[in-house]
From Swiss-Prot:
Keyword field: ATP-binding, DNA-binding, Endonuclease, Hydrolase, Nuclease, Nucleotide-binding, RNA-binding, rRNA-binding
GTP-binding in keyword set: no
Broad EC category: hydrolase
Summary of activators and inhibitors of this protein: Nuclease activity is stimulated by interaction with MutL and inhibited in the presence of non-hydrolytic ATP (ADPnP). ATPase activity is stimulated by DNA.
HAMAP family listed in its UniProt record: MutS2
One GO MF term attached to the UniProt entry: ATP binding
Listed name of the protein: Endonuclease MutS2
Family, per entry: Belongs to the DNA mismatch repair MutS family. MutS2 subfamily.
Native source organism of the sequence: Thermotoga maritima (strain ATCC 43589 / DSM 3109 / JCM 10099 / NBRC 100826 / MSB8)
Record function comment: Endonuclease that is involved in the suppression of homologous recombination and thus may have a key role in the control of bacterial genetic diversity. Has ATPase activity. Binds to DNA.
Biological process annotations from GO: mismatch repair; negative regulation of DNA recombination; rescue of stalled ribosome
Positions of ATP binding: 321-328
Subunit structure: Homodimer. Binds to stalled ribosomes, contacting rRNA. Interacts with MutL.
Gene it is expressed from: mutS2
Keyword flag Membrane: no
Length: 757
């Protein structure tokens, strides 16, 4: 029994097939079915998706379906020139793809496609022997060149003689010309003059007035041309056979290349599908959890994401709610996504989604839209359920839609409960939809089951398609009837016919729905506040980092200026000595030594004076020539440890000047306003086209503010936006480098860019 069809599996595969490059990939996609070990395929899809996000599309050349050409080679028939060209381009594409993955860091892709065999010699031979238009080149063989050279010489001789014949026999010709038919040069001779020249008549015009004659003097020449043409044909056949035999001798390698390219094309299509549907690669887990799962058959503008989690201590969901509320789509999505994951497909959902491997996936999907189900429909469903119950075990995922419907509600409910109990006893994991109140109550009291319902908006009389976990759904019949204007007297009459327990249950369900709606609203508010808090926290952390960076840059500048000054003074002294007009060289050297000794003595004296009399822990100081004020922490051996707020430096006391604490504010040239410019931008939610001007302006702002590094927050998702940002940065000559952030900077959700300043 094909349960995959009832879960829409084949329809989704058809969508994916549209992204394949050739029939090779489309055929491979048709072979993918759920398996208990989908790791291989999923890891390859994940690596190729990461490749796309970083490098864009891989180099693809001529990766077409050459299955027919391979079959022809196997049969022993030589390939035609255009077929050889097609195979050659395909094999050249294999080489390009193999080399591309060899130089990248994707181990699974590298390992898989390293098995592609190189046919470089064959490709070179084809390029030598066959022109791009499919004609056999003169370079194909020396013999072919000889034949064509002789044929060309002979043809020129015949044309020269033919021109002479036309000129000398113009009186017998119907027209001053000759024709080339069936490899022979013929002349249109007047029928009445056909005996004027010896030759062979080949054709007669429809009017009978003209005969096409081959003069005897041309017969031998024409025969020689025909012979050369036959030799040319045989030589070309030999060349084509020779090229085909190269492929035949490596048939196993050729077939393996075709299989590997079919697999690559299949992976390519799945990755394109993931990028188009904002999908992610979900790997087998020990639990079931859907995070913003989107059924791929529902148009993007109308799909409502499904969020659902089955706790480890539970083995089933009973989902209730009004018709057209999304129950069937919800359970179908669970089954479909499980089957797709087990077949190696990415899923249209968010990160955090988890799915289990089930060796058996079985489903009976009802017709939720049916107004009235007949006995035959009930029998049809029951036949499927009998098969499911018979085969179910602890390895089974069972999807049952509208269980117990289509018959008497009391009997249907009893039957549904009995079926659910049997499936749970066998260890199956179940997802069931129903309208029946006894089944809802049963689920509320069963330790292995969870109730869920589809949210309904009584104000608009329409479903929201959101799943509410932990509470059964109501029919909302009275609310809908009242809203549509049914007499209240009739509605009250209907209510009075409900049992006390039924009224209490409906009231309880309604109350739970209201409370859950409030909790969901609070949850959304808290989530929004948390996101705002995280943004604020990131902002302050960045402000702190920027302030610290600018402080360090300020001290670097001061130290550079100090060193420049020292070098300048030394240079001036050297020049003074060099241009001195009096005194000997030895005297000059002695004078320099004396100056340097005095300088050292002076500095030592300043150190001692500063250490003993001036600089002490707690003092506020500035570096010589500097503006930033710091506080002395300790003084040891002529060196002070100074705290400048965001930075501590060890500085010779001779380079420090005591100052007042207030001077820090008055004299410091350092000024930073974190609110004036931020070194990060958040482009999440934008398209690449929307983000491009924002990113370029951000680079402008960085350079105008003299800041070399910035952070672009694009989020993770499919990586399409990140890939687009990298392409923008790669083309911008102002950009020095860019990379993904470290874990502390935001990981692959952030790009760190450095610009020229």
């Amino acid at each position: 029994m094909d349960y995959l069809e009832s879960l829409d599996f084949p329809k989704v595969v058809e969508i994916v097939k549209k992204y394949a490059l050739s029939d090779l990939g489309r055929k491979h996609l048709d072979t993918l079915k759920p398996t208990v070990n989908p790791w291989d395929e999923l890891e390859l899809v994940e690596e190729l998706l990461n490749y796309f996000n970083r490098w864009g599309e891989p180099p693809i050349k001529g990766l077409n379906d050459i299955s027919q050409e391979v079959e022809k080679v196997k049969s022993g028939s030589p390939l035609e020139p255009w077929e050889l060209l097609r195979v050659s381009v395909f094999l050249e594409g294999c080489d390009i793809l193999k080399k591309e993955f060899e130089k990248r860091e994707y181990s699974r892709l590298k390992e898989t496609f390293s098995r592609l065999s190189s046919f470089r010699e064959f490709v070179e031979e084809v390029n030598r022997c066959i022109e791009q238009d499919g004609e056999i080149s003169d370079r194909a063989s020396p013999r072919l060149r000889e034949i064509r050279t002789e044929k060309k010489r002979l043809s020129s001789e015949i044309k020269r003689k033919a021109d002479d014949f036309v000129r000398t026999h113009s009186q017998i010709l119907q027209e001053q010309m000759y024709v080339y038919r069936d490899g022979r040069y013929l002349f249109p001779v007047k029928a009445s003059m056909k005996n004027a020249v010896r030759g062979i008549v080949h054709h007669l015009s429809s009017s009978g007035a003209t005969v096409f004659l081959e003069p005897d003097e041309f017969v031998e020449l024409n025969n020689r041309v025909r012979l050369l043409e036959e030799e040319e044909r045989l030589e070309i056949s030999r060349i084509l056979r020779q090229l085909t035999n190269i492929l035949l001798s490596r048939l196993n390698d050729l077939e393996r290349n075709v299989e590997l390219i079919a697999r690559f094309d299949s992976l390519y299509a799945r990755v394109k599908f993931a990028r188009e549907f904002n999908g992610t690669v979900v790997k087998p887990s020990s639990r079931i959890r859907l995070v913003n799962a989107r059924h791929p058959l529902i148009p993007k503008e109308r799909v409502v994401p499904i969020n659902l989690e089955l706790p480890p201590n539970k083995r089933g969901f009973i989902i209730t709610g009004p018709n057209m509320g999304g129950k069937t789509v919800t359970v179908k999505t669970v089954g479909l996504f499980t089957a797709l994951m087990m077949s190696g497909f990415p899923l249209p959902c968010d990160e955090g989604t988890e799915l289990k491997v089930f060796p058996k996936i079985m489903a009976d999907i009802g017709e939720e839209q049916s107004i009235e189900q007949s006995l035959s429909t009930f029998s049809s469903h029951m036949k499927k359920i009998v098969e499911i119950v018979k085969n179910a075990d602890s390895d089974s995922l069972v999807i049952l839609d509208e269980l117990g419907s289509g018959t008497d509600p009391v009997e249907g409910a009893a039957l549904a409960i009995a079926i659910i109990e049997d499936l749970l006893e066998k260890g199956a994991t179940i997802f069931v939809t129903t309208h029946l109140t006894p089944v809802k109550v049963f689920a509320m009291n069963h330790p292995l089951l969870l109730n869920a319902s589809m949210e309904f908006d009584p104000e608009t009389l329409s479903p929201t398609y959101r799943v509410l976990v932990g509470v059964p759904g109501g029919s909302h019949a009275f609310q809908i009837a009242e809203k549509l204007g049914l007499d209240k007297r009739i509605i009250e009459n209907a209510r009075s016919r409900l049992s006390r327990e039924e009224m209490e249950l409906e009231g309880l369900i309604r109350s739970l729905h209201e409370k859950i709606s409030l909790l969901e609203e609070e949850k959304r508010k808290l989530q929004k506040e948390r996101e705002e808090y995280m943004k604020l926290r990131e902002k302050y952390e960045e402000d702190y980092k920027k302030l610290r960076r600018m402080k360090i840059e300020e001290f670097d500048k001061e130290l550079r200026e100090l060193n420049d000054y020292i070098r300048k003074v030394k240079k001036e002294l050297d020049q003074a000595i060099h241009v001195a007009k009096t005194g000997s060289v030895d005297e000059m050297r002695e004078a320099v030594k004396t100056i340097e000794k005095e300088k050292k003595d002076l500095e030592q004296k300043r150190i001692e004076e500063a250490t003993e009399e001036e600089i002490k822990p707690g003092d506020h100081v500035k570096m010589e020539g500097g503006t930033s004020v710091g506080k002395v922490v300790e003084v040891k051996s002529g060196t002070a440890l100074v705290d400048f707020g965001f930075l501590r430096l060890k500085v010779p006391v001779s380079k420090l000047r005591k100052t007042k604490k207030e001077e820090k504010k008055e004299t410091s040239t350092f000024s930073y306003k974190p609110s004036s410019f931020r070194t990060e931008i958040d482009i999440r939610g934008m398209t690449v086209e929307e983000a491009e001007p924002v990113v370029k302006k951000f680079i402008d702002d960085l350079m105008m503010n003299g800041i070399s590094k910035g952070y672009i927050i694009h989020g993770k998702g499919t990586g399409k936006l990140a890939s687009g940002v990298w392409e923008i940065l790669r083309k911008d000559k102002r950009v020095v480098s860019f990379r993904f952030g470290t874990p502390s900077e935001g990981g692959t959700g952030v790009t760190v860019v450095e610009v020229k300043v």
